[in-house]
Amino acid sequence: HTLEWNWTDSYSYVLQPGPYTALEVQEATFEVDTSGVWETGPATANVHLSYWLPSNTEMGEQVPVIAVISPYFSYGQPGDESGATNVVGAGRGEFIYDNYIPHGYAFAQVSVFGTEESSGCFDYRGEGEGWGIHQAVEWLGQQNWSNGKVGLYGKSYEGATQWEAAVHGSEHLATIVPISGTTGLHPLLYKNGSAEARSQVMHMNYFGSTVDYNGDDLDNVCPDIIEGLFAGPVTYGMGELDPYMANYYEEREHISKALTNYNGSVYWVQGMQDWNVDPHQVFPWYQMFIDAGFDVRGMLGQWEHNYPDQWTKHNAQESGYGGEAIQNMTRWDWGQDLFEWFEYYLKGVGEKPELHAQIQRNDGEWRIEDTWPPLDRDFAEIPLDTCTQTGTRVQGVSVSGGSVSGVVIECGALSGDSDISISGLATLHL
């Protein structure tokens, strides 16, 4: 049997359109007690969100909510800002609006503290931000039109906010779908013995794009912002000697806390060629969540920092960096696949989805594994003295680019008589 997918848009669709329509957008602002999260910040702050209900709520039906929680509403410099929460977000917002509202889901867009019309400190990935996110999930799950189930969706920072929500373990948070979502700030920016150059300016870049450069900005400034401006450059320069590792970054590590506190399911989506939020943000946590009893499913493609169905971005990768997989990369079944996931975990409808990892090989072929990396793997070691090295390494380049490496190490085949499938990240011991 051949399924006919809708290929006419920039994102995928469900197989059958739903019977309902979206009602007019509604907005809500509610106050949150923040006296316990910011030592010198405001004692209260407001969360602002917008939401669209399906037309079946007019008949008294209660529906689940799919939400995107983000700093990116009204994001950017004054005069060049992105859309507010009351405008359906391009890409990920339109995908949810067009696919799932007609099937009886509410859709919400939430701005984190210190962004758009949400007040308080812009606490970049910090405790205050997570507290506001948790309160938004609680609010969505407690409305009289809600069935009490909330699912979160989004990529990158909008994937990180899902883990921030999971830390608090709301009874309303039934599932998360982090797409290349950051699980911890320190391992994002500092790994394998070195720091990324962007670590110096990440906090300032976000803060500079969320303020309006007027008197209202004073409400967005807290000690953690000042600390963040120092934490990045200090980490970049001092590495393991960085005194901020034990406090600033610990507060911004979410996944180990979610492992303890969260009670929902996880649909993990990750680009295996994503060098913005690279796969170590997911692995080995993927198996750890399975071991802890979570329902976990994965879609792991050779795309970069993109959605599974974002075909407009699945076209410019170089050989060895996903280029060989482009011809079979885009998942036009993503809308339907996710619909079945939401139906089960947010409505209790249909069969339980298979809990496996769909992993795309370098050559583009997709395979099914129980987990990733597979448990039945063997480790292979290659002594470097059997390899050849050419090139030079140049140190002392400006902080904007770090050192420049031109070293090439060539080693023999892992096996001379059989094909080898490599999974995971190779480790170099010097």
How should these model regions be labeled?
Residues 12-61:
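N-terminal cap/lid segment of alpha/beta-hydrolase-fold proteins
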Residues 29, 315-429:
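C-terminal, loop-rich substrate-recognition/catalytic regions characterized by aromatic stacking residues
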Residues 61-141, 312-322:
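Cap/lid segment of the alpha/beta-hydrolase catalytic domain
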Residues 85-86, 90-96, 102, 164-261, ...:
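Accessory cap/linker subdomain of secreted extracellular hydrolases
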Residues 128, 153-222, 290-340:
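A catalytic-pocket lid/entrance helix-loop region that shapes and gates access to the active site
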Residues 144-156:
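Alpha/beta-hydrolase fold nucleophile elbow
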Residues 262, 268-270, 274:
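Short beta-strand/loop motif that positions the catalytic acidic residue
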Residues 275-283:
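Conserved alpha/beta-hydrolase "acid-adjacent" motif
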